[in-house]
From Swiss-Prot:
GO MF term list: structural constituent of ribosome
InterPro entries: Ribosomal_eL31, Ribosomal_eL31_CS, Ribosomal_eL31_dom_sf
Domain of life: Eukaryota
Protein name: Large ribosomal subunit protein eL31
CDD domains membership: Ribosomal_L31e (cd00463)
Organism: Drosophila virilis (Fruit fly)
Length: 128
């Protein structure tokens, strides 16, 4: 159907502040990657997943998540990143006036005992 002239367009949901909790399957994203490149590639894949999921170009990764990804290192002994990781994606307003992006996404690590039966959930955001 064609829109009539008087209809208002809906606001985009991308401009809202929202927090989601997701599971990222890292094993399929770093498959066939050399062992020395797995942790850096996992960080890049988390960024890519977050950009697609939240619709923001400015993605900031928390240090706890970075340490968890790098916990097994790149040595020959462990050789791998965690298979899955549970993260909280928080889209927030950017307070910096000279930034080109109005919103940014903060990615934080959520420790879970098991990944069974977890779904993507909207979380009530608590601003720190």
């Amino acid at each position: 159907m064609a829109k009539t002239k008087g209809e208002k367009r809906n606001k985009s949901a991308i401009n809202e502040v929202v927090t989601r909790e997701c599971t990222i399957h890292l094993a399929k994203r770093v498959h066939n990657i050399g062992f020395k490149k797995r942790a850096p590639r996992a960080i890049k894949e988390i960024r890519k997943f977050t950009e697609r999921e939240m619709g923001t170009n400015d993605v900031r990764i928390d240090t706890r998540l970075n340490k968890h990804i790098w916990s097994k290192g790149i040595s020959l002994r462990y050789r791998s990143t965690p298979f899955r990781v549970r993260v909280r994606l928080a889209r927030r307003r950017n307070d910096d006036e000279d930034s080109p992006n109005k919103l940014y996404t903060l990615v934080t690590y959520v420790p879970v005992p098991t990944f069974k039966n977890l779904q993507t959930e909207n979380v009530e955001s608590s601003d720190d």
